[in-house]
Amino acid sequence: KKMIKEYDSIFSNNNLDNKSNILQKLIFDDIKINSYFASVCADFIRKKLLEIRKSFTFETVMSSYDKIELLKLAKELGYKTYLYYIATSDPYINISRVKNRVILKGHDVPEDKITNRYYRSLGFLKEAVKLTNRAYIFDNSSIETSWICEITDGKLVDMKVNTIPKWVNEYLL
């Protein structure tokens, strides 16, 4: 906590206007980075950007409730929020893709973790959509990604396909 507090000055208005200055200050040469430390840093940065009212975007599996809380806070602070949600019809597709990534020297994720995150993320989808000004829902189960629907203000649904994937019906509509 103390170490992260030391990086608080990175987010002064002067520093935000100079991207190379920010990047230089975010180099942690003396720290062996692990996924937990990286997630704490990312959360700190997101909350700081909200605090100083700067626009930002981030990628997440959305498998923990803190992302819903972040959307709530952003909405309370007057941010316009957009969600680009991409899922597959089955967690085994994701498992297969991770195995392929490992073959290509990418990082591995245990199968049980992939499956658990898959269902937790889908479980948060409806609440996340309700908190957004606009949500774009995609299915990435096959080679071609399908744009399923666009949802405005958490209510108005504009379907982009004739056949709705089962996961969309089950977890969103």
Predicted regions and their residues:
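N-terminal phosphate/diphosphate-binding loop that engages ATP/GTP or pyrophosphate donors
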Residues: 1-13
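Generic surface-pattern signal
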Residues: 9-12, 103, 130, 173
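Glycine-rich phosphate-binding loop used to anchor ATP phosphates in small-molecule kinases
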Residues: 11, 17-85, 121, 128, ...
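Secondary-structure transition/capping residues
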Residues: 57, 105, 109, 136-139
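Conserved nucleotide-binding/hydrolysis micro-motifs of P-loop NTPases
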Residues: 63-64, 87-92, 142-144
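A glycine- and Lys/Arg-enriched "phosphate-lid" helix/loop adjacent to the NTP-binding pocket
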Residues: 76-124
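NTP-dependent small-molecule kinase module
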Residues: 127-173
